[in-house]
Amino acid sequence: MKNAAILAILITMTFISCCSYAQQGSGRKILIVYLSRTGNTKAIAEIIHRNTGGRLLALELVQPYPDNYQATVQQVVKENETGYLPPLKTKVDSMQQYAIVFVGFPTWGMQLPPPVKSFLTAYDLSGKTVIPFNTNAGYGVGSSFDAVSALCKNSKVLKGFSLQGGVERDGKMLVIKDEQQAAAEVKVKKWLQETGLAANR
């Protein structure tokens, strides 16, 4: 009888411990913010979302960039030269509720796109875990990951993810689809596991 009582207590304690752990895990709120012009960064954001859950949010501007590629390039060059931060149409209510913030963007002029600078400047991410992810035309992330770290000095910035996407200049738009999307999913999952953020699904 005594042994049975002890066993019952141990089972109860284990159950409570497991429930507590599950509640902590489910309470880890994730925000996945991304800027995407050709759809490639969006594709990566959606893969992350499928594997981590959380809220998926596209960054949109009050005044969108021109549809014309060269016009957008010229505008971004001026914004980078002057330090102009374009106003965001996208708003995040109660940023304090999120513990983990993924920030996705393409490489523009080998730099962090101005709208992403706007986002990281507008919201206080102190004490949060920030994880950058990127798509590019084959020339890499440039200074973009360093810029994220510089703008998030009071955050824990984890190892970023980067993948080659389209080349809008050459008319190659959304390329992360079909077989390339499947390959990207494998790479994203591996990265999430390395950072300890892959969901147990």
Give residue spans per PLM region.
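Short active-site-proximal "capping" loops at secondary-structure junctions
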Residues: 61-65
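Charged, often glycine-rich, active-site loop that binds/positions anionic groups
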Residues: 67-81
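FMN-binding flavodoxin-like domain, especially the glycine-rich phosphate-binding loop
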Residues: 11-31, 35-60, 81-105, 109-201
